[in-house]
Amino acid sequence: MTAPYLGNPKRTIEVLQKYEFVFQKKFGQNFLIDTHVLDKIVNAAEITKEDFVLEIGPGIGTMTQYLASAAREVFAVEIDKALIPILEDTLQDYENVTILNEDILKVDIRKLAEERNGGKPIKVVANLPYYITTPIIMGLFEGEVPIDSITVMVQKEVADRMQVGPGTKDYGALSLAVQYYAEPYIVANVPPNCFMPRPKVGSAVIRLTRHEKPPVAVEDTKLMFCIIRASFNQRRKTLANGLKNSPELSFTKEEIQNVIAACGFPEGIRGEALTLEAFAALANAFVKLR
């Protein structure tokens, strides 16, 4: 297996110039040019020769080379067709890599895992475009894809939101959704100078290890997340007002007040004060009203 040779500014510039590549803002392209960060990502993902790895947004193949050297198979999905000939060049010596030119949100990942990995859990590794981080991660979790872990580069602010608890300014619907499905752990903070071009914000590598089973028992998961969204759509409103004003919910003011009281919460409590367990209790109480 060929050793990785990309991952530094000089080699990246050489490849980009060779193909006269122009960065596309609409794709949120920021390529990693720091080998230490690449090592941290691959090590955090705990890739072995048994693993099937889905890489989202391989760029010029920098991290793909690292992944291919460690995994059984890498399936790289790249939306920018201008990068496909570059990937075919930089990855030509890696026989265990498949490249697909497609929007990851249009890929049937569950079917992919079944066909390429026998339905066993896959590992997802990516330097994600920041503008589409949440739809990708939630799509993976909510789509019932068999996943072992997701190790990704994201905007630092988003990584912080994924792992915080109640009572903090970053706590919200994303925190609760991620923590329902996985155990989040920030591996490293990454400064802008580790990318080309440099992003205007700080970044972080976060690993999301899928729970074998959710940490709370919920009779209606969809309802729980409707309640969560309603609780944070207007953060400064009380929980009762947030639920009453939600277009996703149809409970009366009296029903809402009765459920909140039955769960033992103060009348003026806000959603930002509730734990995942508390939201599960709320959802289960509302289910009984049906």
Regions from the PLM with identified roles:
Residues 1-230, 261, 272, 281-288:
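Catalytic cores of RNA-modifying enzymes
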Residues 210, 229-290:
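C-terminal lobe and adjacent flexible extensions of AdoMet/dcAdoMet transferase-like proteins
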